[in-house]
Amino acid sequence: MSRIWKRTVRLVCLAGLASVLAAIATTVSAEDKPGDIRGTTLDPTADNLAATWRKANLVLPASLTDRERWQGIPSAAPEVTGKAPLVVLLHGSSGVAPAVKDFQIWLADTMGLASVAPDSLAIEGRLTYVSPVSVEIYERIHTLRLAELTHALEASKAWAWVDRSRIVIAGTSEGSVAASRYAGPESAARLIYSWSCEANYFVERPRLGFGPEEPVFNAISARDPYFSPSNPWNRDYAVTGNCAGALKGNPHAVVLVVDAEVHTILNRPDVREATSHFLSSVLKP
């Protein structure tokens, strides 16, 4: 039994003791129905990528501001001195939602970590959807989100305070696909929430970009409404519902399978606790 499987079993037991505090990521209005699409734009043009960064949500911990935690758009950020890690967080299909901001605040207040979440929905006419839609549309979205991540990593080079050797790439749901596909050099670790790293209705194929020994933390509900075997949209795929298969043999990987049915889980106490242990181990000065 590999290390990843041992950790998975231990963390599953932990997850079963906690209460369910999260809700489904994408809120569907009464007028929406499966397959609905609004907007058309998914092109990763320079202007579109700039818009995602311009409206990004940046959160700086008090330790970097010498005052108190700061939150806002990058252009309004206060001066920061010294060097510090940075978490680049890709939101899900509902945008920079309250759950995303809450997670960033937790990173700042509890972990002392700065984070930035580019806003994909800042793109004018950006296509949004109610699953399921065609895999071609999903793949265009994943291409855009990966371009947003690459742009964010490049744009963050303007911040002299970022320790480029301690950049964490994170994503939740839709954003986790791009977070897992990034194959560039700037990744000290990954946080993959609510995505299973495997072939299913949401992708043509996983196209994973992390290395065989790169630190990766994956957390997902056992009965996730989108990516678990219980979703009928996955009936043509041999899904397990988590990233354990993709991470098997990786000595620096942790997979937390939560005993729950909800999709958005990054703010659950058990998930936060496991995330804290993981980040503390990989971001040692």
Model-derived features: positions:
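An N-terminal hydrophobic leader/cap segment in hydrolases
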Residues: 2, 20, 24-76
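Loop/turn elements at helix/coil->beta-strand transitions in domains of secreted/extracellular proteins
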Residues: 83-86, 111-114, 164-166, 186-190, ...
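Primarily recognizes the serine-hydrolase "nucleophile elbow" in alpha/beta-hydrolase
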Residues: 154-210
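Bacterial N-terminal signal peptides that target proteins for export
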Residues: 2-16
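Alpha/beta-hydrolase active-site loop signature
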Residues: 94, 121-124, 197, 224, ...
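C-terminal catalytic histidine-bearing segment of alpha/beta-hydrolase fold enzymes
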Residues: 248-285
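Serine-hydrolase catalytic machinery in alpha/beta-hydrolase-like enzymes
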Residues: 51-162
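The feature captures the conserved acid-bearing segment of alpha/beta-hydrolase catalytic domains
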Residues: 189-257
